[in-house]
Amino acid sequence: MFSKSLILRNYFSLLDSKLLDLWGSALKQFARGWGTLWLSMCLAGSAFAAEPAKSTATAAAKKPVAQAQRNTANAKPKAKTKAPVKARVDTRPSFGKVAGLHDVSDELSLKSSVALVVDQDTQEVLLSKNDSAVLPIASITKLMTALLITDAQLPMDEMITITQDDVDTEKGSRSRLQVGTSLARGELLHLALMASENRAAHALGRTYPGGLQVFVGLMNLKAKDIGMTDTRFVEPTGLSSKNQSSAKDLVTLVQTAHREPLLRDLSTSDSHVVDVGRHSLIYKTTNRLINNPSWDIGLQKTGYISEAGQCLVMQTKIAGRKLIMVFLDSAGKLSRTADAERVRRWVEAKHRAVVPQT
């Protein structure tokens, strides 16, 4: 089959050799224009004649597609599956790591960059590591929140409803306390201390007489009153890295909170069941040492945000001594309790070395 360009070249070549000498330049342009039009019509006609075959082929190709569409329409809809929700992982280094506190060594090779162990009765310091460093304290904050609630002697049976204001926008942390859930103040206090429930702690501060801002102001005033000179609070949960303190100050906080029987009981319980509507929720302690028979814990609180690392404070009895333990900025999920175990074995070993075995 000849191409359009080849036919045109042959045609104009013929005109140039036979006709143009006779008819002149004017007739030459007329002949060129008429010839181009005629050949274009011929080629277009041949292309048009071939089009039905293409349409037929296209129609034939569309039949399976149409059939497949009908089959899909008649098929039963498949159940939709939701993609699993992935927790937001924060990989930022802790303030202590950035400050180089982990480079400081200690005799027990602790994973915590800050540690302080004090005899509760004599105030003797048994172990100290970066105890004046001011760092974020995460949910250790909730001890101060709980202390204010008990100080105010608010009715523990008063019902409090979780609202949108209690939802964490700082870290996007999850909670099983849905907006609209109503629980007694005492139950919210229990969940805040034992299970470190953030919405519970925020609701306690939000519903305090005067509101949240008044509550936070009182947190700072209370800290000052009991001698916490390195401490600052900006909210009641510990989700903000601006809630900061030192190990020395936290020893004071633990000693003060330990005087409250309710805080001792709630912080050291291993589980609690709350009724929410037509179902129940089971909450468990965040401190794995609570159920360990080797430990006698009188008060405790755990904490974690990326800026603070793993944190743990406790009042406990080891080898007959009442001790206050503070561990901040521990690296690794289980490292804070592992550090506590190292200290316990160390204290017991020192006790055995001093007291003759009978």
Stretches found by the model and what they are:
Residues 2-114, 349-358:
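N-terminal secretory targeting signals
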Residues 29, 33, 143, 316-318, ...:
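Hydrophobic alpha-helical segments, especially transmembrane helices
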Residues 41-44, 154, 311:
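Ubiquitous "structural anchor" signal
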Residues 70, 75-81, 85-248, 252-261, ...:
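Active-site-adjacent loops and short helices of periplasmic peptidoglycan-processing enzymes
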Residues 228-232, 238-358:
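Domain-terminus/edge residues, biased toward the C-terminal soluble/receptor-binding domains
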